[in-house]
From Swiss-Prot:
The gene is rpsO. Keywords: Ribonucleoprotein, Ribosomal protein, RNA-binding, rRNA-binding. One of the primary rRNA binding proteins, it binds directly to 16S rRNA where it helps nucleate assembly of the platform of the 30S subunit by binding and bridging several RNA helices of the 16S rRNA. GO terms for biological process: translation. This is Small ribosomal subunit protein uS15. The keyword Ribonucleoprotein applies. Residues 1-24 are annotated as: Disordered. Residues 1-11 have a biased composition (Basic and acidic residues). Coiled coil: none annotated. Pfam families: Ribosomal_S15. It comes from Rhodopseudomonas palustris (strain BisB18). Belongs to the universal ribosomal protein uS15 family. Part of the 30S ribosomal subunit. Forms a bridge to the 50S subunit in the 70S ribosome, contacting the 23S rRNA. The lineage of its organism: Bacteria, Pseudomonadati, Pseudomonadota, Alphaproteobacteria, Hyphomicrobiales. Disulfide bonds: none annotated.
Amino acid sequence: MSITAERKAEVIKTNAKKAGDTGSPEVQVAILSERIANLTSHFKTHVKDNHSRRGLLKLVSTRRSLLDYVKKKDEARYKALLEKHNIRR
């Protein structure tokens, strides 16, 4: 359900603004989106796993908060993030 270290490094590399950037909202949203996608596929086979579903809702909420922050700071970055990660709003 969690992403591997290699996959996480790849996500960071593709979304980082500069080398060593792991804390920018873009990188955090990308990592959360990857984890959400993994959990979503998990629920296709494990429908009754409600403990993990609660974790999924927490991840979605955290991602939503980060997206709200980006929207408040820069609308263009926000729209680019939504488009890049196929997030519905």
